[in-house]
Every structure is written in C-alpha cells, then in structure tokens.
Amino acid sequence: MAAELMIEEAVAKGYPPAVLYLRNDDIVSTEVCAFNYFSVFLKEHPDAEAHVWLFDRTGKHVGYFRRDLGPNGQLQLDTSTLCSNVSGTVAMTLLPKQDTKVRSGRKVTTGYYAQYYSKHGAITLSHEREPVAAKSFPTSAWMQTYLSRFVESSGVVLINSCLAADGGSVGTARLMALNGDVLDERSLPSIAPMGAHRVPTLELFPDAKRLIGSSEGFSMEFKGTNIASPFSYYEFANGKFSLHHF
C-alpha cells in the first residue's frame, strides 16, 4: 500500500488541494465527487491519483483516502465511511501518475464537487473554490444576501484554508441592510488552520430580527485573515437545507 501523501507535499508539487466544507452527522453526510480530467488533457499520461484529506472543526487531521484513477476514471467517496461523525473541512487533489512538472510559481488546482445528503431527502452540492494556502492571507470582504422570512433558519459556514501552524483566522462579521447600512458588527471567534465554524444568523446577531425590521432581505459580510469563501445556508425544521458559496 502506498504511503500517505502529506498535504504539504501536494502543495510543494504545485497541486494544492482545494477545500470544501465537510459535514457528517446524524442529519447530513458528505460525498466527494471527481473525474480524472488528466486523461482528457494529458492523453499520453492518462492515469492519476486522487488524494483526500479530512479535518475536524478544530483543524485536526482525522482521515485520509487515496485511489488510483485510470482513463476517464471517477471518484464518488462517501466520507462518512471514513469519519462518521465529523464536521470540518475536506481537501482534495488529483496528481498525474507521470511526474508532470508545474512551472515555478504556477499551480494546478483540482475541480471537484461535494454532495451533501440529508437523511430527510434533501440533496445539495457545491463545487470547490480556493486551494489551501501555505501562508496566512488577507481576506477581502465576502458578502451574501439572505431572505428575511428565513432568518431563523439561516446561517453561515466559515472555513480557514490556511495550513500554517500560526495561521488562525481573525475577522469581523457585519449585519447589513440592503441599502448598505451597517446594522450590527461582531468580532468572529478564531478558527484554527483547516478548521471550520458553522453558526446560525441569530446566534451571531441575536438582535437581527429587530434590526432587519420589515425589509424583505438582509446581507452578512465577513472579512479578516485566513477566511476562505464562506457558505450561506438555510436549514429548516423538516430537515430540508441548502448550501451556497458566497
């Protein structure tokens, strides 16, 4: 059996894993889906390796998976078989089996999807966004609009995609009116490297309903350091839910 590839090694090779939210609990399970696109773009070297790393919400490395993918090979990995009751982050990369050099300063990120299955019958998915970062990075302001009538069911998932041991995230959250007025502002709790934090809107802003008033919508803004593109979510009492990148 091949030895586990360290995530830092993948970054050094020029193939930094891309990061997504991981949720495996008594309501939702996460499936990672990928296609061996190297067999399309590198026809002379069509074989690839899929590497998947799992982290809990505190950034602790809790699982690893590797699979060889031949021409047109596909991966559909139910991560709950590796970590049945862990939520945090998942990172995945594809590496060509043939050692294909990446030009200095360049990087190749992996396109893949995560599908989230609710035991109540809902399915939602997300494509990957940012790759992991070896060093701390500033976060531009991320903003998303929500429907006020679902404020009690809404929330945000924040992810720290930095690998550095001293790369904890810091930042602020703003509750915004649709006209751009700031209704409330809070400091965010620090998130450990490769960790994640899922928080309901009313936990983050307890007075949100009063502040939003009769407006049909509101926005939340997040900025700071080491915060990857957040996810907005709605999760209803009947188990239905949705998840979207900012």
What residue ranges belong to the model's regions?
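Gly/Pro-rich, tryptophan- and cysteine-flecked surface segments typical
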Residues: 1-246
